[in-house]
């Protein structure tokens, strides 16, 4: 279940597990919220990062496809990155939001989906509950899995350099 900060759970089949459908619903709900919240903005953008856990890169790519299918520009890291760099990249690119696929300190059978706002911090009130409401409205048939490759920009070493210079 999507809660404050995102999702976290054991990977596997079912609505109470981390899989392409629960990650897809979370991303579709966040996309819906961003499109409502920033309806007057010409370009909405997000950063997508991930860690080294099983399926993290897969969940990141699926999320990038869903964001882009909803008209949202995606800055997708080319490989795993630490959470602080994902937060930095959100601010660096002037994005409205971002996600990081990571289960942090949890055991290896877990994965997670952390949502961040435009300041690079985890989503807080009132956005957290509004995003949860949007995620809870999503059905499997609502999820737009067919990405728009023109809206996905792969990022990597160029961001690493700026990030490391700032630390």
Q: What spans do the regions from the language model cover?
A:
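Glycine-rich loops and low-complexity Gly/Arg-rich segments
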Residues: 26-28, 71-74, 100-102, 123-127, ...
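Residue-level preference for alpha-helix termini and adjacent loops
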Residues: 1, 6-10, 17, 79, ...
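An N-terminal, well-structured beta->alpha segment
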Residues: 1-63, 150-167
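Short, glycine-/Ser/Thr-/acidic-enriched flexible segments
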Residues: 7-9, 14-16, 53, 81-82, ...
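Ferredoxin-reductase
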Residues: 39-118
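Gly/Ser/Thr-enriched, mixed-charge loops and adjacent short helices
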Residues: 111-167
